[in-house]
Amino acid sequence: MLQQILHDMYIDPELLAELSDVQKHILFYKMREEQLRRWKERETWEALAQDEGLRPPKTKRASDKHIQWLLGADGEVWVWIMGEGPGDKPYEEISEELIAERARLQAQREAEELWRQKEAEITKKFRDALANEKARILAEKWKVEMEDRKAAKVLEERIHEEFKRKEEEERKRGEEQIRLQEEQRAKELYWTLKQAQLHCQASEKEEREWEEQLRRSKAADEERSRRAQRARDEYRHHSLRAIQKGTVAGLSSMFRELGQSHEQEARLYHHLPDPGLPQPLALPVRTWERPLRPVSRDVIVRWFKEEQLPRRAGFERNTKFIAPWFHGIISREDAEALLENMTEGAFLVRVSEKIWGYTLSYRLQKGFKHFLVDASGDFYSFLGVDPNRHATLTDLVDFHKEEIITVSGGELLQEPCGQRDSPPDYHLLFE
């Protein structure tokens, strides 16, 4: 389009109206430049024509326009010498006008050059201002993120202190309840023994019945002591699990359940039949009791099948296929060997042997990084790195394909590292 305008030295007024001021200045500059080029070309040919008798070349236009020389009465080209004809200006005046025109054109070129310099300065000024504004926005964003993390840490510490306080209160209530039960039972045994002493003169049959009654009472006491000890152990175990999970709701629910179990035990204790006929309580049997930490590979496999398979850990989203980044129980060295020949950003997720969760192994430009993923609760999150919690393991991986794991490292999950051997290293988990 620009070449066509410069060729015709004409632009449609509607098109000109749509141009900005800067574009109009540029177009004007280009058209003047083209005029000067043609003028200089013509001057060169005129000089050659004077020296060698040549004529300027005809410019072929797209519209097939041409020039026809005016002929005089003698049939030759009609010639008019400027300044010598009737009514012409003197040569000196014409020369002055040409000099003035050249001076005007030179001043115009200098003005255009100054405008280009000014335009470059304006562009650089606004480009620098835009860069500074972007830097300021990034700095403010980083500051807000740091403040959010500090607030989250303070909240976590406050929740932890609340856990400890509630645990101590519940422990005191449990100990007080056991103490009251022991005192009440001691009174009952005292009166039982007292009555037995009063009837010591009874017959031999009554003596045997009394001994049998005493034996059963002691057995009932031992059974109640064992139940109390089991309740304390179960309370301690659930307290540790609640702290590991990091949820107030889980601990509160456990407190309510423990309180209900203590109340139920107290009600059963008050409604026990005669000590001569003790009835043992039937305690529920749990099929899977997870240890505090993994103790063997068999326990890890069972944990994965019991708790992680129902949550679709290791599967792609909304499919029955196992994710390419998922691996089984492999060591740190095996993970680094798999990532050795891959580029920065490659990663895999393997089942951890240290915690109830996983380890995300990440390939750096030089070396590797390993991040622990906690899966002991109802969510998945990095330990000590990222406070974000995710409903599934796939959600965590997809989230960090777009968001970095740490601000200092800038780790972004890019290329999953798949299986190299057959059968795959996770086959024991899905058998």
Swiss-Prot record:
Keyword Membrane: no
Assigned GO CC terms: cytoplasm
Keywords: SH2 domain
Signal peptide: none
SUPFAM superfamilies (alphabetical): SH2 domain (SSF55550)
Domain of life: Eukaryota
Gene3D superfamilies reported in the protein's UniProt record: SH2 domain
SH2 domain residues: 325-417
Listed InterPro entries: SH2 (IPR000980), SH2_dom_sf (IPR036860), SH2D4B_SH2 (IPR035839)
Region spans: Disordered: 211-234
The keyword Nucleotide-binding is assigned to this record: no
PANTHER family (UniProt xref): SH2 DOMAIN-CONTAINING PROTEIN 4B, T CELL-SPECIFIC ADAPTER PROTEIN TSAD
Protein's name in the database: SH2 domain-containing protein 4B
Organism: Homo sapiens (Human)
Gene name of the record: SH2D4B
